[in-house]
Amino acid sequence: MLSYLFMISFLIPLCFLYNCWWLIHSLMFLLSFVFMIMFYSYADFNMISYYFGFDYFSFSLILLSFWICSLMITASGSVYLSSYHSNFFVFIILFLLIMLYCSFSSLNLLSFYIFFESSLIPTLLLILGWGYQPERLQAGLYLIFYTLIASLPLLLVLFKVYTVSNTLYFPLLIDFGSYYFMFYVFMFMAFLIKMPMFLVHLWLPKAHVEAPISGSMILAGVLLKLGGYGIFRVMKIISYLGMKFNYFWISLSLCGGVIVSFICFRQVDLKSLIGFSSVAHMSMVIGGLMTMNWWGCMGSFSLMIGHGLCSSGLFCLSNIIYERLGSRSLLINKGMINLMPMMTLWWFLFSSSNMASPPSLNLMGELSLLNSILSWSTFSFLVLIFLSFFSAVYTLYMYSYSQHGSYYMSVYTCSLGYFREYHLLLLHWLPLNILCLKGEYFYI
């Protein structure tokens, strides 16, 4: 598997050759397909080296990273056409892909931590370098400080873990039992902020609103999943305390998900609405992981993959409108069925997937999470009813406001959509719905 890492690394010199944008794009898709074909060879645990290896969970998230990074280049046609440092832009995407590959395949907690934090740097460069408004500086500061405030305590905890157990190697780590309550809090907080959990989520809508399309895609598609993956990995170290105190995180995330759903009703910014809906979906993932049962972990896994494809597709749709009308406001982006009738079909398909209707992967994930959380506490159905219902309400609100009604009077006409854009949307939607037919993949 080290060969894939080398192949990505050798794409970097191509970035600085003249007019190699689409060559790199094609090679990244080729790499994604080759990686996908090799799945059955690496379905079980597989070692790359002493510090690197991956299992079922990390393999799928690496594949998602390959796929989303390839689609980021497809979506960023405007960067290529404007020639605004397009070579450096592709270099950042490849560097980010290497960081994600190393994060998901790390078997050592310290190397996982280093690559986990390193993925922040290229994301920040994407927001600051190719964002649209001057407020992107504030969004970048939010992103850095929210993430780093919880990361320093996590580093100190890792040093203490090494002192106690003399190793940071995942398979050899043991449960610390009833000691070190602060271990439990500090170890979870860095990952919960990354997901993000309600109350520490304010950086996400800001980052989404100010980020270019590529930044929003990788942020919603993969970087949020780093938090869930981290919780999944460290759960066994603190499972004893988790049995006692996880109810707090479950309650907070589920109630927070309902509150965030209400916040979605008040949004008039399209990207902000999709960003807040990510927080609502991730609240169910946190709830499922914290129950620490098989249904919860597998449901979180499938919802993370489904949400990564679905929210990335929705950001692509909002960007397609933004490139034509120059606004993200729902007050201006209305009646789009009159201007772009073919694109309305894609809005409907992604909106229906976002509210977890069949045959999307989100449905499979949400059903598993409902099963998991209800088996943990029957009374949680009171919150889950509202969470599932309002998820459909704000998605339909977004769809109906943006597509129906009279269009903005100052807009006379616009392009119906390029082949590149429809191709991009198809490559998001197809795996999102076809994977539902391969349900056993997520429940081994």
Indicate where each model-derived feature is located.
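Core, highly hydrophobic multi-pass alpha-helical transmembrane subunits of bioenergetic inner membranes
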Residues: 1-444
